[in-house]
Amino acid sequence: MRQLVFALCVFASPALAELEQARDMMEAGQFEAAREELLPAARSGNAEAEELIGVMYGLGLGVEQDYERAFEWYLRSSMKGHPGAQSGVGWYYELGLGMPAPDLVRAYMWYTLSAIGGDPDAAISLEEVVKKMTAEQIEKAHVLVNDYKAWMYPFR
């Protein structure tokens, strides 16, 4: 068992170092280099790297701004339980960015999942989106939340 824990620590450390280095590059305004640093981890399914690439596309940092690409990267990260990305997906649904039209039901769902996951800002987003929704939409959103919550957060 100790060998397994040791092996996990050894192999996880380079990935964590790459993410920290990419964050440092982003803070220094070196977005193209940060993206190159993040892509291997993101393509391997690292939720944090996926979320950061979503941020880059959403804001046009080192890449041409592209809401559809941003949404896709956020969604990948969200499906792995990343609370920040879940709030991002909620925001994209709320405003209809990268899609044909807003979808308040799904915005509510993702904000709720984000709040369950620990994003402190998700509750504020939930309060705002509820103001735009009908009772029927909220009811539909609760059904989706319960479906996703059971799968995404089985122990909460």
Model-predicted segments: where are they?
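N-terminal signal peptide c-region/cleavage motif recognized by signal peptidases
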Residues: 12-14
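Hydrophobic face of amphipathic alpha-helices that form TPR/SEL1-like repeat modules
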Residues: 19-25, 41, 52-59, 88-95, ...
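Short helix-capping/linker turns of helical repeat alpha-solenoids
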Residues: 30, 43-46, 59-61, 66, ...
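Sec-dependent signal peptide recognition
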Residues: 1-7
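Terminal, low-structured helical/coil segments at or just beyond the last alpha-helical repeat
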Residues: 121-156
